[in-house]
């Protein structure tokens, strides 16, 4: 055996052998139960950073553990490779996005292989390749056929830096999710998916093992609210409409309406604005278009508006109500119109105070004295100034007012959602082309399935303007109508890259299949994903879209399940000097350098040891060095000669107890994904074994069996050194094809326990006792303890509480 462990040499040797043997190739023919382990695939930015490793390594450890537990594990890998960065690189460096992307794929593939993960490389997918995006386009056509894809003109989020449209989910605090530039609004013809059709299903996570914070974020994103749609009478000579509808969650306050506010984008604004108010209204609309939705909805921003000059009539009491416009109202939510009840809504109260609008109290607090309110009253109370509902508790009034409105044809109960349809159009080149054409005679026509994929042209001119480069490529744009054979033009927008990642987990089940997006038989075997790991930042984007996509495919009869991921786990982040790593801060840790310095296994073990996986931890170079030294000590433990002397029964019992306790702890902790304590337990075991080895009191057979068990538990954490140690023990290749060790409860029991003795809950003594002590013996020993007796003098024991094997609490008075 080698005297000193050489991680780089050993790791390269085993990685090459595993690859040559296709050790981690997953087959559907296995008699074992399946386990689909998946980590969110990386975007092809060019280099893996330590955050990628932190996402992959613990997930790989668990996948390896499941393999040893007898599961048929599939752990595929691929690359999310369409997107704006590639196009920006093309503009900046004068390189084609395809070349830039595939160069990055090659580098990242090399880096991923150094992780030593049990990736099944036969299943690799790359979303920018035609053999993949052909099926992305096929899914678009299926959604179109099902009425779930449509084209409409709508105000959209626009990033002036990226020169691209953003979905609502891609605007974070009023800025672009990618470059953090403040976004604005534009009106464009866009393609949408009717994700709102699935609002109720998407807020329901029953049967899923997902973090509560993610399910809460998705429920809040759907934003389901119950209320009423109420119509106010409109009598305006310049509008043929005879009413304006509002959505309200407070129908019990209908008698307190003193104004109405329309969104600046509301289609009635232009029609109802009087000539004398037109200039002010137009100026306000222009100003509002420079604000993002986040800014418009901000609770810290002062609410303002402009009067249109027109009134509507509140039908329940005949009151005339002025109609204003205000940018805090969004056309995309509800009806784009809200009723103002300043007495019972804080926002409306501030608006009314600012513009000297009336405040009418219609819900009375118990101590109400009839005086004007100084602040909005938003709690429960009794209705007043409310016609036939005076004296009615407002909690009952909500239902009664809804019934009253419905009886008179003035309104109805309704449910509203904050969720908007998914905007998928992008005015960029590097994405999957939308497979639609425009014919003057036939209108909008889908590309026939037989003509897929619609390929991206190679000869494009990249520009930094806000229009797709495809728009200026005549060879791409000009085509033939599939219906009439006449001249037609292709859609020049490409799809949101989240479209590609909404189904990649399905493709992994049969990536080489060419008769459809996946082989139905293999899909049925592998799906759904058993454990999906990745960042929480994808809660209302990738994770949300993937669930919609899966449910839509189910309803189309393409698949027979409605949820893609059974269990979801979000890892934390690794920080440096308490700061998130970034190039600008100069604190990015590059895995390539670490592997060259200490080897893959040391990096793997340290990442799992640094902190709870869901919380992350602080990167520390000295900690990594310490992990490297520990692996060297493990190597020495195995390779330094052991010559047993006279076997000791006591030492043998201690060895078995320590070993079986460790098997139990590691098994339970790894099942809970507590990898930091798994590594800690391995360290403790190695220290215990080193001490026992010095006694030379363990038989050669037991020592050999112990080392085998240790290697098996080490294998998921540090697979390379474990494989080498296993081979050095003369065991059958490969350690990763063996069975996980089991523990014996009897052997794991302590012979001696530490019993805590309390008097009235205060610690008075710790006693070393035999592990099998009875309750009566424990109580008697506690009462007779020399340290306890002084605390019992002059007092009468009321009761003695015994917690088996842990504590005796004597209650006295």
UniProtKB/Swiss-Prot annotation:
Keywords: Aminoacyl-tRNA synthetase, ATP-binding, Cytoplasm, Ligase, Nucleotide-binding, Protein biosynthesis. It is an enzyme of class 6 (ligase). Its main location: cytoplasm. ATP binds at residue 583. It catalyses: tRNA(Leu) + L-leucine + ATP = L-leucyl-tRNA(Leu) + AMP + diphosphate. Transmembrane segments: none annotated. It is found in: Cytoplasm. One of its GO terms (biological process) is leucyl-tRNA aminoacylation. One of its GO terms (molecular function) is leucine-tRNA ligase activity. Its EC number is 6.1.1.4. Signal peptide: none annotated. GO terms for cellular component: cytosol. It comes from the Bacteria. A motif ('HIGH' region) lies at residues 42-52. A motif ('KMSKS' region) lies at residues 580-584. Belongs to the class-I aminoacyl-tRNA synthetase family. PANTHER family: LEUCINE--TRNA LIGASE, MITOCHONDRIAL, LEUCYL-TRNA SYNTHETASE. This is Leucine--tRNA ligase. It comes from Dehalococcoides mccartyi (strain CBDB1). The lineage of its organism: Bacteria, Bacillati, Chloroflexota, Dehalococcoidia, Dehalococcoidales.
